[in-house]
Regions:
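Flexible inter-repeat linkers and adjacent short helices
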Residues: 1-140, 148
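Amphipathic alpha-helical scaffolding segments comprising HEAT/armadillo-like alpha-solenoid repeats
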Residues: 28-37, 59-71, 91-105, 127-136, ...
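Short inter-helical turns and helix N-cap capping residues of alpha-solenoid HEAT/ARM repeat scaffolds
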Residues: 42-43, 73-74, 140-142, 171-172, ...
């Protein structure tokens, strides 16, 4: 019996054994998009492992995801994201990335959990690119130049005189309001009247018209001139102002026939 068991044991030992199974590491087969999506996982540990796995990745698609993780509710994840951005700041493309993702950088400051030293690094990098600041404020429209102008004023990234020059000619109406507010508070009535009559922007004409009308600066000749504005809202305001002064429209049109006004 013992001899039979020994023979069976020898036979079993001669059967080829399968190779030990290698534990699959899920990160190996995941694309960058999938890994970036994992950074939004509900599991804080999963986010941590993903950040650790991506620590040497400098693909541009990852940058905004790291900005978002600066406010991660798990402290180690905030630290990992901050360390990654700190390393990235030594690379030549970092400045352009900060510019491209400025709105996300601004959003970081509005969150409860932040990493102040990295926020300062990001903002200082944007501030150093004065050509970008000036071009964006003067030539673009929408949320980006509006938010950027707030930061420029708050942190004095551009000298006030230069910013006034840029905002006066800015394409975005909200950015122009910085210049408008400044001149209505600081310039003379004569200067405001000059800007009113020479501005090519509807919002500037209307706002300055309203300011000067409320201050009782405009005479009937000024209002008549504005009545011929190419902007309907300004024309309508001027018509209202003339009616308030009991302007004799009949006599005016007798002296200035509509055909003559149209040709002019």
């Amino acid at each position: 019996m013992a001899e039979r068991q020994a023979l069976e044991q020898i036979h079993i030992s001669n059967i080829p054994q399968p190779e030990p199974e290698i534990v699959d590491i899920p990160f190996i087969r995941k694309s960058l998009d999938e890994l970036i999506w994992l950074l939004r996982d509900y599991d804080g540990y999963a986010r941590q492992r993903t950040l650790e796995h991506l620590k040497d990745c400098y693909e541009q698609e990852l940058f905004p995801a790291l900005l978002f993780r600066l406010s991660d509710y798990v402290e180690i994840n905030r630290e990992l994201a901050a360390q990654h951005i700190q390393r990235w700041s030594q690379r030549p493309e970092f400045a352009q990335l900060c510019i491209d993702h400025f709105l996300q950088i601004a959003a970081v400051q509005q969150r409860v959990r932040t990493v102040p030293e990295i926020e300062n690094l990001l903002l200082n990098t944007v501030a150093e690119n004065t050509d970008y600041l000036q071009h964006t404020v003067s030539s673009e429209q929408g949320q980006l130049p509006r938010v950027l102008s707030i930061y420029i004023v708050k942190y004095q990234w551009i000298e006030q005189e230069k910013l006034l020059e840029l905002s006066k000619a800015a394409k975005d109406q909200i950015v122009r309001k910085f210049w408008l507010d400044h001149i209505t508070q600081n310039e003379s009535a004569q200067k405001l009247l000059f800007e009113l009559k020479h501005s090519q922007f509807r919002d500037v004409q209307y706002h300055l018209f309203d300011v000067l009308y409320q201050r009782k600066i405009l005479n009937p000749e000024d209002i008549i001139e504005l009545w011929h504005s190419r902007f309907l809202s300004v024309m309508d305001y001027a018509y209202f102002a003339l009616r308030q002064q009991n302007f004799d429209f009949g006599n005016y049109f007798n002296q200035h026939p509509i055909a003559l006004l149209s040709s002019q």
